[in-house]
């Protein structure tokens, strides 16, 4: 176990222990004669052992110097004090399944070097009878393990190897394991993306880099947060040291070390192999980059790729691994018999998991094991000694190797977990394009020196013409999503039984439900106005009969004094008098309603013995009605606030002093009245925020829908944000979002203060701020990791991707919106903006036009009762990035020129859902965008051609160039939108570099004449365009 506090996942332990005992009861693979199983793990140089795999599979950790004894009716664990505490949650009667026997722990006794404990365990083994199962071939070097093995020998216990039985047990992965393996594959493919970019940089700039240096760089990618992004919070490492090979020195052994020789980046093939080991689960990837390949080498690559795909397709449940091997050999032989001769025929892959390579489940000619659904295989095909004639002797021999990690599915195609690292030929070919020397007549010797020889630039298929292909693929995928969208929406809404809103039943405001409750006060008997504060009613006399009115029926009342009389006017709520949500509260709107009543009373005493005048009753009634109305409206507002709010479970406090904790945090919104700091601490089932004043706010894990951690990089605050599933009532208000943050740096700056560029105080303060930001990021990140471990990865924090952010106006002010793995958020400004992508039906772009600088984005949710969410004023330059992001999230989008009234649109849809989908559903949004595409296609002939522009500029005199310079610049700016169409016609990076070089040459030619022109006065027309002035 590591130095960090570990927590045993109780449910997962019993789930897997139950699988183990069921496998044991079947008696397969020699387990029928085994009555007990004993395992111990110690120090070893081998990172992959069956014992460590068993401990990781059962407990989630490699637990050294601990004996695990499994009997049919009991489980014993011998370990140190800390390890006994680790198993505390599963000992005694804590088990959740009757199939798993009781777990007991024994505390190590170092006084006799555990001789007494060993004797107890051996007695239990002998009582069980039969042989003890063990991984006989595994050797460990620790003193504790040696003592245990010696005790077994002295006790006469016979060991029996059960490696094959546990190989079959570990081979089929459960849902938790599949999830971790998928994440491991994501880390592997993310590292390959970074490695591929590194290769392009090396080849393009002709750098000399050693194979061993690249191996270390690729290993670092596994832990680089910029490469892994959301996966950086997991414990990830490499399965083995990355292997980088080129220049004819190739080996297909997994323990091959990358050489100290330099990478051959100008010819042949570069083979790269590495894999991620995330949370102890392994995946692997091998790719071959072809550098300026011959046609024979490309054909060989296609044949090897076809053989790999054939092996992947043959790995179906029920198939023998030897038959799968034969299919791979036959496919390669059919494609190219010569390649089959130099194939690495030992095996074409193997099963993987916690152990990188399971040799007993290898795809080889002699392995007759049967494939099962849920198994994970690494398919690896490598061929050596392939001729590469184009590059002479140096390019021979070449080698090609391709490897992927796949998950066997019960039905349908197998899942290629590393599919994002594309293995197709055009994604792994690098070619050079020799740029011809500029042969135009140039008289200036400086220009010739500047031009030099022709340059070489890397041309990747994905960088040039394939952009058009990617755009077409995106459009095809969007069409598929559009069809699926209507089908799924129609099916979903039909199950819901229509989209009609359920009207909330309003509380019946009846004054007195029984006659006994009617007041018998003296004012009622005297036919005066009586205000009953107990039942929120007003009793007024009408034709000599006291009539009660509930306070909710009184719209308002007014009092006036005219001469000797006081008037009280009461206006009642009637149908049609109220407009809004409460307009439909009348049960019988067609009945007769009283609109107003006016009472008059004298201000003069009727008799000198009276203590008050008759008008006193009206004045008192007026005051009490006003007070009652105010109180009733306040209570109604509180009840409305409580609607939808849930009462959280009780927070279970953890007594451990090492609970994850953050101090000096502020809270938003202002649940606590005063702006004071506090601490946030993670407990067993939730968080508790405690202010310095003692205020407490609890947030439970099971009510958190999304948890976000936003670092303080380029931000003024660092924060943790919780978006809740159900609103929670804190105080008298309900909240669905709560945020804990710390301010970083100065929010305001004194502009009147004198600043010097080399002011030591300012430089020191900036350095201190950078250091503080680093410490804060580390502290918050550590808190998130500890919470994740505390909850056994059941609770995770999501972080926004700053690189995918874009500006927009979700409410009233412009903010930066950033995507996360599951949402689009803005957490810095308040109120926060959070859209859950899984709840989004589609996205529509409004006001998309070349004449406009901004557009709007509207989110339509799967629940049509929810009001669509709009983000306005997004810069047009961000639309392609947003489309690509939505495409990767499999969200259908559409665009149009006009802005729609979404309240009316949604009402029309929900009024008649069947008719809406029969008429095409949401496809009506794409009508405008289809028309726009047709108009764009008709304008392709007017696209800007830089080469023609260069020719016309080169043929003119220097003075002509000066005069036309501003016009050319404006033309470049205006025609910027047409560059995409030029690229679709085959323009690559080298062409663009050539145009830039030509522009620089012309600029240098023009510089001397400009210098001369500056010495004499110029007219306004002869100067450069204002767009060129800086």
From Swiss-Prot:
- Report the principal subcellular site: nucleus
State the name under which the record lists this protein: FACT complex subunit spt-16
What's its job?
Answer: Component of the FACT complex, a general chromatin factor that acts to reorganize nucleosomes. The FACT complex is involved in multiple processes that require DNA as a template such as mRNA elongation, DNA replication and DNA repair. During transcription elongation the FACT complex acts as a histone chaperone that both destabilizes and restores nucleosomal structure.
Q: Where in the cell is it found?
A: Nucleus; Chromosome
Listed under subunit, the entry gives: Component of the FACT complex, a stable heterodimer of spt-16 and hmg-3 or hmg-4.
What is reported when this gene is inactivated?
A: RNAi-mediated knockdown in embryos results in failed hatching in 83% of animals. In addition, these embryos lack the anterior pharynx. RNAi-mediated knockdown at the L4 larval stage results in failed development of the anterior pharynx. RNAi-mediated knockdown at this stage results in defective cell cycle initiation, duration and completion in embryos, and abnormalities in chromosome segregation.
Stored SUPFAM superfamilies: Creatinase/aminopeptidase
Renumbered to this chain, the Acidic residues biased-composition regions fall at: 929-951, 958-983
Q: What keywords are annotated for this sequence in UniProt?
A: Chromosome, Coiled coil, DNA damage, DNA repair, DNA replication, Nucleus, Transcription, Transcription regulation
An annotated GO BP:
nucleosome assembly
Q: Where is the composition biased (Basic and acidic residues)?
A: 435-449, 464-477, 998-1014
